[in-house]
Amino acid sequence: MSGHSKWSTIKRKKAKIDSQRGKVFTKLSKEIIIAARNGGADPNGNMRLKAAIEKAKIANIPNDNIQRAIQKGAGGGDGANFEEFSYEGYGPGGIAILLNVATDNRNRTAGEVRHILSKHGGNLGETGCVNWMFDEKGIIIIDRSEVNMSEDDIMLAALEAGAEDVKVEDDSFEISTAPEDLQSVKTALIDQGIPVADADTTMVPQTTVKLQGEDAEKMNKMIELLEDNDDIQEVFTNYEEE
């Protein structure tokens, strides 16, 4: 998550989907498999699976693919043996990097991550070295172009639903919640006729750091390569883009 608005980041990622649809399908299918493996095949009783299915539908993954991924995860067959863990490290200028990984080959992934970081002025760190710089939050995005309510009404509805804060951006409202309250706040907003453009848990940096010149170029390239890696599900940093 960069210093730009979360909605801007989401739209930037969605713009890449058409050119990298195969990678997007792979990552979202993997998330569905893991969610079904850990919590069962019924999305009504498995919030992680429900969220993964919603992401897959937004990315236009065919329903047949979604169902196959659910069956693969719930059945525990081949392809369901992904290991989940996090890597922590640093980018140029001491930027904090937190990576959520799901892989069937830890050694391969470690080598690839280490190579990407070291080639662009960063390095892997020990467990816990940067995690403390982030807070886990639920983030709900409301696209301003999709609602006719005033800022005050949106903020009041969100806070009454249990949100912690509402950030007003040029093109969106970014509503933050405790992770465990994400689904209930989202449901309450939808029930009031407020369309939700995106909702997910994320790691929010407590403070952000700006880079300039060569360091900024290296950091941008590093993030691009990390996000493109099939084994890396999520990339979080405290880097604030100019």
Swiss-Prot record:
It is found in: Cytoplasm. It comes from the Bacteria. SUPFAM superfamilies: YebC-like. GO terms for biological process: regulation of DNA-templated transcription. Keywords: Cytoplasm, DNA-binding, Transcription, Transcription regulation. The keyword Kinase does not apply. One of its GO terms (cellular component) is cytosol. Its main location: cytoplasm. InterPro entries: Integrase-like_N, TACO1_YebC-like_2nd/3rd_dom, TACO1_YebC_N, Transcrip_reg_TACO1-like, Transcrip_reg_TACO1-like_dom3, YebC-like. GO terms for molecular function: DNA binding. Belongs to the TACO1 family. HAMAP family: Transcrip_reg_TACO1 (MF_00693). This is Probable transcriptional regulatory protein Dred_1658. The lineage of its organism: Bacteria, Bacillati, Bacillota, Clostridia, Eubacteriales.
